[in-house]
């Protein structure tokens, strides 16, 4: 023992000795001689602190290296297990012996680290036991956020079922790490090298994994998905499965989930559910809905089919070969049937391209009068109306269908299924669906001829109608679409190759899923939240059409007929308002009555507009004959216009348009025509007839020109007072939803359809702004002016010049600055204020060399706030008001204008009505700040000292 531990005179080793050494020297110490062990402790205390911790750092590094080797060892063992499974499945390979590999496994372990050998090397043979099944191994995780939850659950399940000991956190972390691939494996390697404590804390490691790879917006995305989820044409089982999958990511209570589940059900199931006792749980609600759906299906199958049996029965179901079908058509012989089957011809009509169950001849024979059957798009021939023939049973599985949401201002959202067909040339909508939902229509610029797959034109003829721009949502994807109106009974909406080529979506045909990941959709089709309106404009009336004022003087010319005919054509055809849908049951015997009523409407419309303008511009001596002249001329002109110049197909559209917009109130206007008495000319107020000899109540045009310096003088020359809309609504009028705001006979609503200009200054991506500038303004120069005046130019330092170049280049790239063709460009002035460079714009200097047209300027509310908080208003007439009203000027002055916001897929400019307002008080230029800033005023002088007290007198002292 003395030999083992008594070498007290030997120097200590470089690292300090461990605390539990084997020195068992019990020799008593001499009080006079210092002990060698005390000398060693004193020397150990004098060493630096980093050398004292050197042993611990080295041990920790060795442990980390061994643990990383253990991770690689586990991965190799799993790879070997995969090979063993492949060899077990192959009956021919029986000579495989895993013993050599098992003998080589201990070579990777460290002989000095006995603990690591016991934790990693010893349990390795357990992976080769028969109790562990290879199918229970979790799938490799590559960092996909959608697969993080299943991966964590599979790892937990495997560790609980496995015979291997996973009680140590280090083994659990190594196992999970071996299941990571791709970017997830790279993250785990770097994370474990930096944070070594995670190797001994399985819970903390899984929390870090979840924090990195879990979708932070998972809950918000689940809320949006579950609110848009609808049952649609599918069964309740599929709807409930999708609902429960989304509900897993939400923390909603069960009553909230039950309410949302009922919102997405079909109306028939929801109606039947309301007649029963309310279920208590979500599972009971789903079970009740499934029972209701099955009962409705049984009732529908037991109900006799009112349609003709020949439409749904196959041709070989008839037994009598001599029984005529349709009176004159006999049954086919066996030879003829065999020939048509071999040549893939229709068994009903003998033509190619379709089969007997979808034969258009059969559909046209059984279709009602006035409705032509035929294909809806360029593709396979379509069938007859859906109310006569039911679709085939495989219709829901053969085609790619999606659920669309169509938004129209002031109307409930429409949910409709659409088919995606790459063989269709455009985007189509069924005319029955349009009529049923009153979707606004307009006449196309050019008719479109659509052909079927066999090259023949469709039976419904050329397409002459299209819908207005509608907001269409497909999941999180929002766009603006215009559909061509045709006949498509099986699919109300068809999205064709034009839609596919524009958005370029990623379609997975096996799962029927669509992902919009193209650059076009990322920048233009994102879902924007509706921004609430902070202010409501004072509602003006729409402005008088400019070219109507332009043609006032030609109207009083002797050649008035030609100019009025040209004006009426220009006014009717490019009218921005909607054309009503055609009535499929229109009969020709109603044409005479319709033309008579149409003539009265047009007479009232033209008389109402022409009389006040002509009364204003004609000499006073011609006022008394003005009514008689207009009365005779308009009757003669309209009769000739309707019978010789206007196409008969447009009569009905024009009649319905004027009937909806000019139908007089029966309580106030029993006669649609103006009075025939020349002493009672047409009125300026729709409810009162003023005297024609009385001067118009408007001011003198020369005085109007000086009323407001911001107004265009040319506009005031033709300005005339217009009638005020009736303040009272008709009692039979249906009450509008609270979405509208009634103000003076007009309504204003939140601009849902203008979402793409609300966020025009909000970047949708890093340094990417949506395009919002349509045209480049043209500046008219004063004749003789050579150039616009410029300010003084001062030299700039190199750093200031680089800062200006970077600023301009960055904003041109982002789209906030656009190159212009205007003379002299923009007046950019670089100023240095408070140690910061700023770019300002001098907007007063160019006015001395340009023509001041005083265009109507648009002002937005809350100009100091971000621009996307501004709201726009659109003005439409209240139904029941008989006359279109026009702008009248009050203070502050307001009117409407068409503002370009972009282009559609055809390249046509999309304009929206906006509010234009100007006022002397709200448009004053702010004072220009002085540079350098003025010195503060000097402080006021101090107050004078108080006067001294008077001296005391001798009398008072005595």
From Swiss-Prot:
Pfam families named in the record: Retrotrans_gag
CDD domains, alphabetized: retropepsin_like
Practical application: Can be reprogrammed to form virion-like capsids that deliver engineered cargo mRNAs bearing RNA signals from PEG10 5'- and 3'-UTR into target cells.
PROSITE patterns per record: ZF_CCHC (PS50158)
Protein location: Extracellular vesicle membrane; Cytoplasm; Nucleus
Predominant cellular place of this UniProt entry's protein: membrane
Gene3D superfamilies listed in its UniProt record: Acid Proteases
GO molecular function, one term: zinc ion binding
Region (Necessary for interaction with ACVRL1): 131-326
Compositional bias per record (Basic and acidic residues), positions renumbered to this chain: 662-715
Tissue: Expressed in a subset of adult tissues, including brain and testis. Expressed during the early process of adipocyte differentiation. Expressed weakly in mammary gland but strongly in breast carcinomas of a c-MYC-driven transgenic model.
Zinc recorded as keyword: yes
Region (Disordered): 1-58, 84-110, 299-337, 360-396, 661-739, 921-958
Induction: Up-regulated by MYC and during adipocyte differentiation.
Biased composition (Acidic residues): 47-56, 85-110
One GO-annotated biological process of the protein: apoptotic process
Complex formation: Homooligomer; homooligomerizes into virion-like capsids. Interacts with ACVRL1. Interacts with SIAH1 and SIAH2.
Protein name: Retrotransposon-derived protein PEG10
Originating organism: Mus musculus
Originating gene: Peg10
């Amino acid at each position: 023992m003395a030999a083992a531990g008594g070498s007290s005179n030997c120097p200590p080793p470089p690292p300090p000795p461990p605390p539990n050494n084997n020195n068992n020297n019990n020799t008593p110490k001499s009080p006079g001689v210092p002990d060698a062990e005390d000398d060693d402790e004193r020397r150990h205390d004098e060493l630096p602190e980093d050398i004292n911790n050197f042993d611990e750092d080295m041990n920790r590094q060795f442990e980390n290296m061994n643990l990383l080797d253990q991770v690689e060892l586990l991965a190799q063992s799993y790879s070997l297990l995969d090979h063993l499974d492949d060899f077990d499945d192959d009956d021919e390979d029986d000579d495989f012996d895993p013993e050599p590999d098992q003998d080589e496994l201990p070579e990777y372990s460290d002989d000095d680290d006995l603990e690591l050998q016991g934790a990693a090397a010893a349990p390795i043979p357990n992976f080769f036991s028969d109790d562990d099944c290879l199918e229970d191994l979790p799938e490799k995780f590559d960092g996909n956020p959608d697969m993080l939850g299943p991966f964590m659950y599979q790892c937990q399940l495997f560790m609980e079922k496995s015979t291997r000991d996973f009680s140590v956190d280090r083994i659990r972390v190594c196992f999970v790490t071996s299941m990571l691939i791709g970017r997830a494996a790279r993250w785990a390697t770097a994370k474990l090298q930096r944070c070594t404590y995670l190797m001994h804390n399985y819970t903390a490691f899984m929390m870090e994994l979840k924090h990195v790879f879990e979708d932070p917006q998972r809950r918000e995305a689940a809320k949006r998905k579950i609110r848009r989820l609808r049952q649609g044409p599918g069964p309740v089982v599929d709807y409930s499965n999708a609902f429960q999958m989304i509900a897993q990511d939400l923390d909603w209570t069960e009553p909230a989930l039950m309410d949302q589940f009922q919102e997405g059900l079909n109306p028939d199931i929801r109606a039947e559910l309301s007649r029963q006792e309310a279920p208590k749980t979500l599972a009971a609600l789903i079970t009740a809905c499934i029972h209701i759906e099955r009962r409705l299906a049984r009732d529908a199958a037991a109900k006799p089919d009112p349609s003709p049996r020949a439409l749904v029965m196959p041709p070989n179901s008839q037994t009598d070969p001599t029984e005529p079908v349709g009176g004159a058509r006999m049954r086919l012989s066996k030879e003829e049937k065999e020939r048509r089957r071999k040549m893939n011809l229709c068994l009903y009509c003998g033509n190619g391209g379709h089969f007997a169950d979808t034969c258009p001849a059969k559909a046209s024979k059984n279709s009602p009068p006035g409705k032509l059957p035929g294909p809806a798009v360029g593709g396979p021939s379509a069938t007859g109306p859906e109310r006569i023939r039911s679709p085939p049973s495989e219709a829901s599985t053969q085609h790619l269908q999606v659920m669309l949401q169509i938004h129209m201002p002031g109307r409930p959202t429409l949910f409709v299924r659409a088919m995606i067909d790459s063989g269709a040339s455009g985007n189509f909508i069924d005319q029955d669906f349009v009529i049923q939902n009153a979707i606004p229509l307009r006449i196309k610029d050019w008719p479109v001829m659509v052909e079927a797959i066999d090259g023949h034109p469709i039976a419904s003829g050329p397409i002459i109608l299209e819908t207005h721009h509608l907001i269409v949502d497909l999941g999180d994807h929002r766009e603006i679409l215009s559909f061509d109106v045709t006949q498509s009974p099986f699919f109300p909406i068809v999205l064709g190759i034009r839609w596919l080529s524009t958005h370029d979506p990623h379609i997975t045909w096996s799962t029927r899923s669509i992902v919009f990941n193209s650059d076009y959709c990322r920048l233009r089709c994102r879902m924007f939240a509706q921004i609430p309106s902070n202010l409501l404009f004072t509602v003006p009336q729409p402005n008088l059409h400019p070219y109507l004022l332009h043609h006032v003087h030609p109207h009083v010319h002797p050649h008035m007929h030609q100019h009025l005919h040209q004006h009426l054509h220009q006014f009717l055809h490019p009218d921005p308002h909607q054309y009503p849908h055609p009535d499929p049951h229109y009969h020709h015997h109603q044409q005479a009555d319709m033309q008579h009523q149409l003539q009265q409407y047009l007479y009232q419309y033209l008389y109402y507009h022409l009389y006040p303008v002509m009364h204003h511009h004609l000499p006073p001596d011609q006022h008394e004959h003005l009514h008689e002249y207009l009365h005779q001329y308009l009757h003669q002109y309209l009769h000739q216009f309707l019978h010789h110049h206007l196409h008969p197909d447009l009569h009905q559209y024009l009649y319905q348009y004027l009937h909806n917009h000019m139908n007089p109130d029966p309580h106030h206007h029993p006669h649609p025509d103006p009075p025939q008495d020349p002493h009672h000319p047409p009125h300026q107020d729709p409810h009162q007839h003023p005297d024609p000899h009385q001067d118009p109540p408007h001011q003198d045009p020369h005085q109007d020109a000086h009323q407001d310096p911001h107004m265009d003088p040319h506009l005031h020359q033709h300005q005339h007072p217009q009638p005020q809309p009736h303040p009272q609504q008709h009692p039979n009028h249906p009450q509008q939803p609270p979405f509208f705001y009634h103000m003076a006979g007009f309504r204003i609503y939140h601009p849902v359809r203008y979402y793409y200009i609300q966020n025009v200054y909000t970047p949708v991506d890093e340094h990417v702004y949506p395009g919002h500038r349509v045209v480049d303004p043209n500046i008219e120069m004063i004749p003789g002016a050579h150039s616009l005046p410029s300010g003084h130019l001062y030299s700039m330092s190199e750093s200031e010049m680089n800062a200006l170049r970077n600023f301009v280049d960055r904003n041109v790239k982002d789209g906030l600055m656009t190159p212009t063709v205007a003379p002299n460009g923009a007046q950019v002035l670089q100023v240095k204020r408070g140690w910061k460079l700023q770019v300002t714009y001098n907007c007063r200097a160019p006015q001395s060399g340009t023509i001041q047209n005083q265009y109507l300027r648009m002002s937005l509310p809350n100009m100091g706030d971000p621009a996307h908080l501004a709201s726009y208003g659109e003005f439409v007439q209240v139904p029941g008001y008989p006359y279109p009203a026009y702008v009248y000027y009050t203070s502050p002055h307001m009117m409407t204008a068409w503002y370009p916001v972009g282009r559609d897929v055809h390249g046509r400019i999309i304009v929206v009505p906006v509010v234009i307002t100007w006022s002397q008080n709200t448009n004053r230029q702010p004072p220009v700040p002085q540079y350098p800033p003025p010195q503060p005023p000097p402080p006021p002088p101090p107050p004078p000292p108080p006067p001294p007290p008077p001296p005391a007198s001798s009398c008072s002292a005595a």
